[in-house]
Amino acid sequence: MAAPAAPSIARRLLLWASMILILLAILEGASAVFLKSVLPKTARFLLWNPDIAAAHKAWAKVAGNWDDELGWPSPREAVMPPRDATGAKLNPDFPQPGQACASAYGDSFIWGDDIPLKDGWIEQLSRKLGCRVANYGVSGYGTDQAYVRFTRNTQDEAPVVLLGIFPENVIRNVNQFRAFIGFAQSPVWLKGRFVLDGAGKLQWINRPRLDEAGFIHLLRDPASVVPHDYLLPDTRDGPVSLRFPYTLTLARLALMPRLRVRFTGSPTWSDFFRANHPSGALALTAAIAEAFVREAERRGKRALVVMLPDAGSFRVRAELGRPEYAPLLAALAAKHVNVFDPAPALIAALGARSFGARSYCTLYAKPASCNGHFGIAGGGIVADVVMVELRRRGLIK
C-alpha cells in the first residue's frame, strides 16, 4: 500500500499563515476589548479617544459658564455655595467673611475632597487656631491657577497665606486641557498656562477663545489649538490615540515613560521632578511658587508653601529615603522661599499614635486602599502638624 503523499510546501505555508492570522485576530480582539472596556475604567489618562457627539452635549450643557483664563469655577459659581461671597469655602465655625488670620490656596488637597465640607484639614486648622482660615482651594487646580486666583483676590485680607502643592501639580502646570490627563472632554477643563521665557521669567499663555466649532476642532486636532500643552496626544508623555491596529496602540502604551515609572512603584508624575525632564515642569513649578510668595510679600503678607503628599509619596520616601518632590524642595530653598514638608512630622505623629505598619494610609479617606484625599482623622493630624509649624515660624500667635 502506497504511503500518503506529504503536504506540499504551498499547503504548509498556507496552514501556517492561517494559524498566524487567527492568532493575530485573537490578539487584536483582546487588545480592543482591553483598550475600550478595561483601561478607561482604570487609567483613562493613558488614552485619547474623543467622543464628538458627547462633546457637543458637553458644550451645550456648560453654555459658556467658565472662567476665561482659569477654566473653573466660572465667575458665577465662584461666589455660590459651597463658597461664600468672597469665593472662600463656607466655614460654619467662622461663617462671616473678613478678619481671617490666614488664607490657603491650592487644589482639592486644600479644599478637602472626599469628606464633609466642615471637616477638611483647613477647617480643622481654623477650629484649632480659633480664627477663620479662608479656604480658596479649587479641586483640579494646578499651582499656576492657584497663583492667578491669589493675584486676582485682592480682597483677601489675611496676614498669612498658605500655598498648598500636591505633587501631581507638577504635571498640571504644563497642561492646558485636563482631558489629556483623564478629565472629561468639556470646555470647562480648558485653561491658560505659564511658560518660562528665555530669561526664565513667567509668561502667561492665554486660554484659547473658542466657539463650539473651535472646541470640536480642539478634540480633532489638539496641537493646532493648544500647541503649548506639553501633554498633547501621541507625544512623549501625552495620552496615546486609540486607533486600529489596537495591538500597536497597546504596544505604544507599554512604552510610555509615565507607565514605566508607575511599574516601579513610584507615582506617575515622579519623572517630572527631574531637572532635565523635557517638560521643564520642575523649574516652572518653582518659579510659580516663588511668584506666589513674592506677590504675598508685595501685599504685606507672610507666605508659606506647604507640600501635601499622597500615599505614593510616602512609599517613595520609605524606599528611597526621600520623596519624589525632593528636587522641588531644594529648588524653592535655593530661591529663599519658605517651604514646609509635613511628611516627617506626620510620620512621627502617626508613630506616636501606634498605628502600625503602613500607618500613613490612615491619613487618607480610603485607608483600606491607601488613597484618596486626607480623611477626617488624618486631616486633624495634618492640621496639628501645620499649626505647630506656623507657630514655630512665628506666623500665627
Language-model features: locations:
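N-terminal secretory targeting modules
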Residues: 1-101, 156-159, 170-226
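Histidine-centered active-site loop/cap adjacent to the catalytic His
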Residues: 15, 31, 338, 361-397
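Membrane/wall-proximal cationic-aromatic binding patches
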Residues: 35-128, 132, 147, 237-271, ...
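Generic structural signal for small/hydrophobic residues in well-ordered secondary structure
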Residues: 107, 146, 161, 296, ...
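A conserved hydrophobic secondary-structure block that centers on an alpha-helix together
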Residues: 132-143
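Short, amphipathic alpha-helical "lid/cap" segments that border enzyme active or binding sites
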Residues: 143, 147, 282, 286, ...
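Short, well-structured alpha-helical segments in soluble
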Residues: 148-157
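Serine-dependent acyl-ester chemistry module
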Residues: 167-330, 334-337, 342-353, 364
